[in-house]
């Protein structure tokens, strides 16, 4: 790695910082050693990250113990990265470039809608809770990046990318991207408790994601659990000064995952790949 601290620790303390001609002393042949002073002084950059979250809730209770809630939210995460390496930076000297600048920005937005309706009722030693809901989530990820090199001056840093002559030679880099996906869920949960001792929970969720293939977008995810609060039993009375809760639980459930890139289930085209045409491989 090129970390400044790592390079400083690796450095032979008897080696000079500067050559006699005023350039930085480098010793690339030994353990990929780079001058840490040069790394500090011959590059500049800025990185900013912002995270914004907005949430709104509306709850109403048409009848006693029955509540319905509407929740809307948006979360936006963005980062802005830019930097510049002078012609004295080790990578620029080794590649015979006079300055390198880059600029990139990325933004990830999540819009979420959730509607839930729950009911609870308690009588004698019994407790009953039920909940049904719907969730809609839309995600968008987009960004761009550009870089250029061979600058006549270091004055502008990353603030004038077009000044580098690599752009005129068709060697500058530029890229952008955007992808989106949708996640929808219907869910329900029922809970029953008796005398604060025994609790049963049953739930099911039907969820669909645009990331999956045409015939595999939806799935069912059931779950069940049984719990026993032993501290409410008479034979545990003498331990209540030491223990406040002892609740064995057994549970079973099926979960899913969609933490992979969008469009993996689709056949896509690009201009950089190769394909077989008329008995030979063609790029395009």
Annotate each language-model stretch with its function.
Residues 1-51, 69-184, 232-284:
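Surface-exposed loop/interface segments of Gram-negative outer-membrane beta-barrel transport/assembly proteins
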Residues 56-60, 115-119, 132, 188-192, ...:
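Residues on the lipid-exposed face of transmembrane beta-strands in outer-membrane beta-barrel proteins
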Residues 57, 61, 67-71, 127-131, ...:
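Membrane-spanning beta-strand positions in outer-membrane beta-barrel proteins
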